[in-house]
Regions:
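An acidic-aromatic substrate-binding cleft motif
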Residues: 3-35, 41-50
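The substrate-binding groove and active-site-proximal loops of carbohydrate-active enzymes
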Residues: 21-33, 54-72, 117-129
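Aromatic-lined substrate-binding rim segments of carbohydrate-active enzymes
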Residues: 11, 37-116
């Protein structure tokens, strides 16, 4: 009797990507666009196949309450797919923009005594806002 590999016992997440999903967070909005091509080359060299994109990008996607910018994200996704990389689009809620904290202070995190934590920390939101 042959023992089946554990990997063979579970269905693939995506049959077009039948490999271990090695990768991590990729935050290109924090770097000049001129570095993105080099990033793709480094991903290729390190067998980095899957990038989580957008975790801290809220302010880059929505620089003002009434303004959205997706051009940079479109460019990054195009570069990733052209370089034969996969991506997971994250919700950009880990770092809310300053305009939101100023316009809606109730979204700021509160400590156990109800004091609001000022803007500038990661994951600075209040779940009950």
């Amino acid at each position: 009797m042959t023992q089946q590999s554990k990997l063979q016992q579970y269905p693939l997440i995506n049959p077009q990507a039948p490999f271990i999903w090695h990768g991590g967070d990729y935050n290109p909005e924090q770097w000049p666009p001129a570095t993105w091509d080099e990033d793709m080359a480094l991903m290729q060299q390190s067998y980095f196949k899957v990038a989580t994109v957008g975790v801290f990008s809220w302010v880059s996607l929505q620089p003002a309450e009434d303004r959205f910018t997706f051009d940079w994200l479109d460019s990054v996704i195009e570069k990733l797919t052209t370089a034969d990389r996969y991506f997971v689009l994250a919700t950009p809620s880990a770092a809310q923009p300053a305009w939101m904290s100023q316009a809606y202070p109730d979204v700021l995190r509160a400590d156990d005594r109800g004091r609001r934590v000022h803007h500038g920390n990661r994951t600075n939101y209040c779940p009950n806002s």
